[in-house]
């Protein structure tokens, strides 16, 4: 079927992606198709859906935010961890383009879709930063506080405490 064929053809593109051969991952190597061809030749397959995720993450890393948003918006997953990552990447792209409302919305989705001690604090931290940039100081304080209360073993804990204290100090003036 179409999906199995697309997945077989996408194998090499995934390999290139994992090896940081981004150009080959996107456009193929002349023998094997890249992610862009998979999306074009096999639309509405699971493989094309996954290719959208890879393409979006590549474009984001290349600071091509508009295309990153377009491809990531076309991706959806049943796996909560992968979908949360896609929401976080969308948040990053929207933050970079100055669309703070959409950045906040996507970071909220990333942080709340399936809480876990490794990724949720990262997504909450990004959400708090977006709140700060949007001038929503109380929401930022509250979000940093959530990291402080629930994720005290996380990498983000110390920075969240520091930023929360800084914002509380500014708010008190």
Language-model features: where?
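Short solvent-exposed coil/turn linkers within tandem alpha-helical repeat scaffolds
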Residues: 39-48, 62, 76-84, 111-120, ...
């Amino acid at each position: 079927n179409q999906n199995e064929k697309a997945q077989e053809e996408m194998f090499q593109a995934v390999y290139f992606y994992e090896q940081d051969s981004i150009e080959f991952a996107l456009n193929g190597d002349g023998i094997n198709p890249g992610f862009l061809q998979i999306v074009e030749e096999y639309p509405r397959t699971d493989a094309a859906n996954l290719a959208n995720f890879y393409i979006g993450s590549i474009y984001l890393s290349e600071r091509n935010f508009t295309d990153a948003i377009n491809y990531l918006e076309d991706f959806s997953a049943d796996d909560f961890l992968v979908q949360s990552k896609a929401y976080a990447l969308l948040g990053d792209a929207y933050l970079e383009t100055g669309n703070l409302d959409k950045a906040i919305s996507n970071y909220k989705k990333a942080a709340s879709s399936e809480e876990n001690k490794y990724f949720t604090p990262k997504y909450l931290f990004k959400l708090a930063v977006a709140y700060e940039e949007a001038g929503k100081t109380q929401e930022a304080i509250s979000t940093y506080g959530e990291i402080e209360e629930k994720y005290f073993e996380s990498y983000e804990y110390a920075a969240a405490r520091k930023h929360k204290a800084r914002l509380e100090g500014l708010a008190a003036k």
